[in-house]
Structures are given as C-alpha cells and as structure tokens.
C-alpha cells in the first residue's frame, strides 16, 4: 500500500476547519478534482456514517467512491476507509487537526492500493496524488483564510 502525506497550517480556529472537513458537500469548493460530495447516512457524521464522492477520472469521465468514517474525535481527527470505488482497490484517509498559535495545523494522510491494471503503478500514482492533495489543502487554506468557506 502506498501513501501520501500533506500538511498545511490554516489561520482559522480548529472548530472551523473541522466543520469544513466533515462536510463532504463542501469538498468540490476546495478540492480541484471533486465534482460532488454527499452524506449517505442521516444525521451528523460519526463512526460508521458513510459518504459518497464523485471525482474527475484520469482519462476523462468520472470515478465514484463510498467511504465510511472509522474514527471521529471532534476538532481533532477524522478517519475514513474506502468501502467501494469504481476504480477498484482499497484505501483509507485520515485528517489530524492540531491547534497551533494563530490557527490549525492539518495533517492529511492517504493510504491506497489501486486495483486491477493500476496495481503496479501504486507508488507513481501516489506521487501524483501527493501533489494534487497538497494543492487541495493549499486551496482549502486560501479559501478558509479569505472566509470563502
């Protein structure tokens, strides 16, 4: 399984950052490849709740995935595992938020094992994803610090 780790410090309170990260409907506003995000489980997010994401595909088209919350500590941690994905494979992701002077540090880790014909390319793919994820958290930072989110 390959992984990608990215970090950013956002000049906003941890509660604000956590609220954005736990709302999948906001992802298309700050994540470049996100087209749609939605909660599949009624009520506030919690362990066991599920969300669906539609993202831009590698060669055009779209890819869809369903993820389940495996860990949720308010204003601290959000972890999810991949339940199903149109591209196959398995994965999990975790956001860890840390209050720092003047804001919030976000550490984001993705662990993924592509399926099918993509399996041999897991490490090169994660290098591409790492760059994309860093752009996304930088965009999240810019949007949150300008109060666009």
Regions found by a protein language model. Give the residues of each.
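Glycine-rich portal/gate segments that line the openings of hydrophobic small-molecule binding cavities
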Residues: 38-86, 105, 112, 135-149
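Generic recognition of short, well-ordered alpha-helical interface segments
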Residues: 12, 29, 64, 131-135
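Alpha-helix N-cap/helix-start motif
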Residues: 30, 62-63, 90, 118
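Beta-strand/loop substructures that line and gate deep hydrophobic ligand-binding cavities in soluble
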Residues: 81-135, 142
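Hydrophobic ligand-binding cavity/cleft-lining segments
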Residues: 1-41, 46-47
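Amphipathic alpha-helical segments that line or abut small-molecule/effector binding pockets
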Residues: 15-18, 134, 138
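Hydrophobic/aromatic beta-strand elements that line small-molecule binding cavities or substrate pockets
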Residues: 6-8, 39, 64-71, 91-99
């Amino acid at each position: 399984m390959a992984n990608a780790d990215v970090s950013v410090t956002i000049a906003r309170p941890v509660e604000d950052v956590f609220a954005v990260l736990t709302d999948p409907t906001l992802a298309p506003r700050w994540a470049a490849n996100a087209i749609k995000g939605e909660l599949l489980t009624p009520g506030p997010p919690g362990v066991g709740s599920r969300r669906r994401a539609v993202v831009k595909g590698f060669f055009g088209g779209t890819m869809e995935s369903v993820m389940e919350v495996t860990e949720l500590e308010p204003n601290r941690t959000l972890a999810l595992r991949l339940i199903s994905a149109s591209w196959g494979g398995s994965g999990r992701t975790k956001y860890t938020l840390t209050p720092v002077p003047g804001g919030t540090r976000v550490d984001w880790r993705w662990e993924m094992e592509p399926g099918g014909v993509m399996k041999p390319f897991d490490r090169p793919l994660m290098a591409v994803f790492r760059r994309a994820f860093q752009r996304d958290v930088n965009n999240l930072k810019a949007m949150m610090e300008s109060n666009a989110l």
